[in-house]
Regions:
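Function-dense linear segments that define catalytic or interfacial modules
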Residues: 40-44, 51, 79, 237-242, ...
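Secondary-structure capping and boundary motifs in well-ordered enzyme cores
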Residues: 37, 59-67, 82, 106-109, ...
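Polybasic low-complexity intrinsically disordered regions
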Residues: 64, 91, 100-105, 109-308, ...
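DNA-recognition alpha helix
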Residues: 85-99
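Helix-centered, glycine/charged polyanion-binding patches within enzymatic domains
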Residues: 297-377, 381
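Hydrophobic alpha-helical membrane-insertion signals
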Residues: 1-33
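Basic, short loop/linker segments at the boundary and entry of helix-turn-helix/winged-helix-like folds
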Residues: 26-73, 78
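Basic, amphipathic alpha-helical segments enriched in Lys/Arg and hydrophobic/aromatic residues
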Residues: 255-258, 345-433, 438-442, 446-451, ...
Length: 466
């Protein structure tokens, strides 16, 4: 029989701290906390963020930036897309409260605090926090900086195509289309005819003509599934030897991939030098690997002049080399040789493995494929943090064999299956050996009229018979 739980007539006025409920210790977040403590994350972050806070000693103290970063970590590892969801999850979970060092009687930060802290901390502070994780990776041999891969993906902006306005006339999109239809002799009230007219109208999605007033930085472009939407373009530079992200930034959705590629690669080299404690002009990068979207002859020249090998396929198969300058011909030929070589093909395979994996973890499993933030700066800050947390997961995988909560759960299931298989193998071996012993024993005792001994558990020496 069970006891029916009744609603309390009057809540308790005083509750002893010893009577408060406690949660079982979260294995993942305890390991994450150990990882952060291993390279002094909290003290270094506070030292980085000190210039952003006033030191007058008056007024209400601000929220610890370490708490803010840990809450964003929770959103990354648990695929929470919005800051409201992150704040609700942190307030609801006792294990996450322990990770944040918050007691049950303390109120966790509200989602509105995220906006204030994000605006308070400049982009340079986020860059230094990202470099802090590179220091930790370097200390554990997870950052080499010789072979780099670069690629971009798509983030769907928190903006709608319906809200587009014309840059010159400030007309809404459909009002503008109806006016053009009327000028071409089409009834503007006929929705089918107007849509057909708009469908066949050239240059209708030009970013030079249209802007979203709620997020002017978002651009019209194609999403991953081919649909037209307002987008941003995140880009990651990855160490192809270890999978660590050495640079992460967000570009406008209409920017070409190859634009200033050489400059961005050299900026990634600066991050590697800072993590390794080397001089700024030290060059460790040997190769740069990417897809056809990053192919530009001038960019190839710039990288090859720095003695960096370019493994980037030419999108034009029958490129007319006789129209190029001698130096350009040399750069194109060198890139072709690199792509066709055995080492180049290996680098292209590693580029697909490491870069696509990083985008899957950050965008699809990290909650920012469809962003809830607006503005290039806000999104760039969030993407840098997500890349830093991805590097933390790489470090956790090195130290503890797990990098995400889902991987920890999968390891438990895998361990159970392995133990089950091991027990099955042991049982089969025991069964074979015991069957042979039983047959010998049965033949020896048959004259004493002892029969029916068919299992090993019934033999002398087994007290439980199990």
């Amino acid at each position: 029989m069970f006891e029916k739980k009744q609603k309390a007539a009057q809540p308790e006025f005083w509750v002893a701290a010893q009577q408060l409920p406690t949660s079982p210790k979260s294995t993942f977040y305890s390991k994450l906390d150990e990882t952060l403590e291993s390279f002094g994350f909290a003290a270094k972050v506070r030292a980085i963020c000190v210039p952003a806070y006033k030191q007058t000693g008056t007024g209400r103290p601000g929220i610890d930036p370490v708490v803010y970063l840990k809450m964003i970590m929770v959103g990354f590892f648990e695929d929470l897309p919005s800051e409201r969801a992150i704040a609700a999850r942190c307030a609801d979970s006792m294990s996450i409260r322990a990770f944040l060092n918050y007691e049950l009687d303390e109120k966790t930060p509200d989602h509105s605090s995220f906006t204030i802290i994000r605006q308070r901390l400049g982009l340079d502070i986020y860059e230094r926090i990202f470099t802090l994780t590179l220091h930790a990776l370097r200390a554990h041999g997870l950052l080499r900086g010789k072979h780099l891969g670069i690629d971009s993906s798509v983030i769907e902006a928190n903006a709608s195509l319906r809200a587009l306005v014309h840059r010159n006339t400030e007309e809404q999109y459909w009002d503008y289309v109806k006016r053009l239809a009327a000028e071409n002799g089409i009834d503007p009230e006929d929705a089918v005819a107007v849509r057909k007219f708009d469908r066949h109208r050239p240059g209708k999605g030009s970013n030079q003509e249209w802007v979203n007033p709620y997020d002017p930085d978002a651009k019209i472009g194609r999403t991953k599934d081919g649909a037209t939407d307002m987008i941003y373009k995140p880009e990651a530079v990855v160490d192809l030897d270890t999978g660590a992200i050495v640079q992460a930034q967000v570009h406008p959705g209409d920017q070409a991939d190859h634009k200033e590629m050489a400059t961005r690669v050299l900026d990634a080299q600066q991050n590697i030098n800072q993590a390794a404690g080397e001089e700024r002009d030290t060059l460790t990068v040997k190769t740069v690997t990417s897809d056809k979207g990053y192919y530009a002859v001038n960019e190839l020249q710039a990288l090859q002049q720095e003695e960096i090998r370019t493994v980037i396929a030419d999108p034009i198969a029958n490129r007319r080399l006789h129209k190029l300058e001698p130096n350009q011909k040399k750069a194109v030929a060198a890139a072709r040789r690199s792509v066709r070589s055995k080492s180049g093909k290996d680098l292209l395979r590693r580029r697909g493995m490491h870069i696509e994996r990083s985008f899957a973890h950050i965008l699809d499993c990290g909650g920012i494929r469809r962003t809830t933030l607006r503005g290039w700066e806000n999104l760039n800050k969030r993407f840098k943090l997500a890349a830093a947390f991805y590097n933390l997961s790489q470090l956790m995988r090195k130290l503890f064999g797990i990098g995400t909560p889902k991987q920890l759960a999968a390891c438990g299931r895998l361990l159970f299956l392995q133990l089950t298989y091991l027990l099955a193998v042991i049982a089969r071996i025991v069964h074979r050996n015991s069957s042979a012993r039983i047959r010998i024993w049965y033949v020896g005792l048959k004259d004493r009229h002892i029969s029916g001994l068919t299992t090993f558990g019934e033999l002398p020496g087994s007290s439980t018979g199990c």
